[in-house]
Structures are given as C-alpha cells and as structure tokens.
C-alpha cells in the first residue's frame, strides 16, 4: 500500500493541477466539473485496490477530455509496475483509439503498449507496436523502441535482424557497435556448431572486429580455429593481440598460449619470456601463477622464491594455494609439516570454492563462467575475470 501511495504522488499532483486549471479556465463548464469528480473517484478506486473500476473511470474521462492523456500514460506505467499488465494494456489501447491524439502522444501510447506486451512476455505483439513507433517517427520514442526490439531479438537469438536494427541506433550511439560485434560472434559460433565452412566463420569474426576492434571474443574464437588447424604461430599472434584489446581478459589466453608454445619452436622459453613481459605491464595473479608453473618444472626453490615475492606485492587466495603446493613439493618437508600444510590447503580450497571467478563491472553480478552478455544488466562484455 505504501508503494502504491508513492507511485500515485506524481499522478495526484498532475491531477490536482489539472483540476485547478480546468476550474480556473472554465468555471462554468459542468462537463469539466463532472470530469473533476470522476478523476477523484478514479483515484479513490486506485487507493482502495479497485483497479478495474479505476480503469473504467479513467477511460470514461478520456472520452470526454483529451487533455488527460499524460495522466493516463502515467497511470498505465503505474499498473505495469504493479504487475497489472492487462489493465495497463486496456488503458493504452483506449488511448490509441482516440482520433484526436497529438502525434507525440500517439507515439508515447504505442511505445507504452509495446512495453506492456514486452513485460507480459508477448514478444510478437510487442514487436509489432515497436515497429509501428519506428515507422511513424525518428524521434527519441523510436530510439527507445529499437532498443526494446534488440532485447527481443537477443532473447530469441535472431542475430541477423538484431544487426539490422542495431545499425539504426549507430547513427546516434556509437556504443552499439560493441553489440553488433557480438551478434556477428553469435552467428559465427552457430556456424561452428553446425560444422560449417570455416571461411564463413572467419568472415563473420573479421566483421565483428571491424565493428569493434576491442572484441576479445572474436579473437578467442579465431585463436581456437588456428589451434584446431595446428597453425601455432598464427594462434600465438592472435592470443597475444588480446593483451592490447583488453588486458582484463589475459587470463583467458594463458591456457591456449601454453598449448601453442608447446608445439612452437621457441617452446617454454618463448612462453616464459612473453609472460614476464606481460606481467611487467599488467600485475595479474594469473600471470604470476603461470610463470611459477614454468619455473617449477626446472627449479622448485626458485618458483617458491618468485611466488613469495609476488604475494608480498599482491596477496591472493589462488597464489597462497599455489605457495602451499610448492612447500609440499620441498624435499625437506617433514610429515608433520605436510599434514599441517594439507590442512591449510583444504581450508584455502574451501574459501576459493565460495569465490566467484567472474564479475560484471556494470552491475556486480558474480559468476563461475564467462558470459558475454550479463544475465542481470543485459550489457555485453562487462563480465570479466577477477
């Protein structure tokens, strides 16, 4: 009830202004007085949770006085927020049916009706009304409608038409190019899943990079294709390019790079050189641990010394876990020490199990897997490794 009162405040304010204005401008009009009484009656129905009667009352007023359109739109939003979608739809449908609506008012009503159907999950109907807004106008209402269409197409995975609509937005918002790049990546991934011609896949990935040069996802897929074709040099070049695209995703390149360097003539020496160079530029725990793994293959003591220095500069649970492993690998580690270290290792592991691996920089959504589209805030490329 308290929430309803807060939602009604702007409507009540608008209604109060409208009533005062109509009385001031035409105090002799019995029709205006009747509208005023009906408005108060409608608000009373709302406050008493009699929504159907409220809708009937407001529709009746609309038939008499077109000046109440803005308030009717606000009421529609109120019903939608309360989850009373059917009543919001009815109110907006009656608005659209009015023959003397101003152009902007009709666009608002069409957009509102599209949003009603979108919230109700009736995406086909929502799409129809959003297109009607776009066909009529190129204003802010049309821009909002296009964004809703993109949400629909993303849910339905209709990537070709999503690209077409997103290009319309690019006229006034260059940030949409990031979305377009991901749509091409989605198409490329679909082709890969059907074992299609890889040339077509590469073409789509190149288009993705054309729209967004920082599209890490496109290069991750390209790198995987190069590995599958055993083109190790090419794969290394692709994965190393990700460091410049977005260093936050360096972690995602370490395992495939290790695979590539094992087959490359420079071997682990080449990989170690690259990792040290990258660590000097970007102090990331994943890089330190990758270096430790390579050093440990030849000298456990040096690996222990290196990791200790890294942890002093940047403590982390994965680093501490690896440090315990290095101590366990020491030749002079006693049985008692091993028992204590294994207990500590188990505790660290439990702490790590409760920690997310990825987090959305936009909304804070935590995840154990890398989603390119955040399921919470619906933004692309905002989920990154921690």
Locate each region found by the language model.
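N-terminal signal-anchor transmembrane alpha helix of single-pass membrane proteins
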Residues: 1-30
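Alpha-helical segment of the N-proximal tetratricopeptide repeat
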Residues: 31-67, 74, 80-90, 94, ...
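Structural register within alpha-helical repeat arrays
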Residues: 41, 75, 113, 149, ...
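Residue at a conserved register position within TPR or TPR-like alpha-solenoid repeats
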Residues: 45, 79, 117, 153, ...
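Structural motif corresponding to the intra-repeat A-B loop/turn of tetratricopeptide repeats
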Residues: 48, 82, 120, 156, ...
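Short coil turns that delineate tetratricopeptide repeat
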Residues: 66, 100, 104, 138-140, ...
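TPR alpha-solenoid repeat register
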Residues: 71, 105, 109, 142-145, ...
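Alpha-helical repeat scaffolds
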Residues: 89-97, 125-133, 159-171, 197-208, ...
